[in-house]
A protein has these predicted regions:
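Catalytic cores of TIM-barrel enzymes
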Residues: 1-93, 106-238
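A solvent-exposed, charged loop/short amphipathic helix patch at secondary-structure junctions
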Residues: 91-101
Length: 238
């Protein structure tokens, strides 16, 4: 039905200099130690290099899957989740109140690189970008902080990706999309699929529609689960 890449949340952060190793307990790549101690210690970050490292292998895998006729989903992490793998999360939360301008600067650079990544992903056969930024989920910070800073930055990422790609569909995790709608960053429209489909089957039909560029209020992890609410939620970014 779908093939999902990658198998961890460290691809983007590693491209920005995070030290990643294989976690012996869980058997997945994880940050071995933080590269920086504080937000103010983070220098100018490098550009993502798609010709080397694991990011290259992710894109190569997408091409292989596309050539096999698969529908490919690429998980992509938002700016704050990327930063939380370069510096302790505690420092990120402090920075939300004390260093907003620096976080905006870093996020703007990361956003530009994520847009490049999205373009490369589309070129290599990715059909859906599954976006999340769980470090600054709406239930972890105040509604005002989400609307004025964290949600706004995610909105900028998504608008830029949408503008830079032609056919990729964005899929927002449930927490992100609900918070997005509450904060006024998007509108929602229900798409009613034929009865008896799983979430993945309904999603597969929805992404074929030319008017659908963003979907939310659902979970990619429920691909094989029967539809419970009977609809797919099309989101339109404002």
């Amino acid at each position: 039905m779908f093939c999902k890449l990658p198998f961890c949340v460290t691809i983007e952060a590693e491209a920005f200099g995070a030290e990643v190793s294989l976690n012996s307990l869980y058997g997945v790549p994880a940050v071995a130690r933080f590269r920086y101690e504080r937000v103010e210690d983070i220098p100018a970050l490098p550009e993502m290099d798609f010709s080397t490292g694991r990011v290259r292998e992710v894109l190569r895998a997408a091409t292989i899957l596309r050539d096999m006729g698969e529908t490919v989903i690429l998980n992509i992490e938002g700016p704050f989740t990327v930063l939380s793998q370069l510096v302790p999360s505690k420092q990120i939360y402090k920075g939300l109140y004390r260093q907003q301008e620096r976080l905006r600067e870093l996020s703007a650079w990361i956003t530009a690189q994520l847009v490049r990544y999205a373009r490369e992903a589309e070129r290599h056969g990715v059909n859906v970008l599954s976006y999340a930024d769980p470090t600054v989920a709406a239930d972890l910070i105040s509604p005002k902080l989400y609307a004025d800073l964290c949600g706004e930055i995610s909105y900028e990422v998504l608008k830029a990706v949408e503008a830079a790609t032609e056919n990729i569909v964005l899929h927002l995790c449930n927490k992100t999309s609900v918070a997005f709608q509450k904060a006024g960053f998007c509108t929602m429209e229900r798409i009613i699929p034929q009865p008896g489909l799983t979430y993945g089957e309904a999603l597969l039909e929805a992404i074929k529609r030319l008017d659908v560029r963003c979907i939310g209020h659902g979970c990619i992890q429920r691909t094989y689960c029967p539809m419970t609410n009977g609809c797919i939620y099309k989101l339109t970014l404002k």
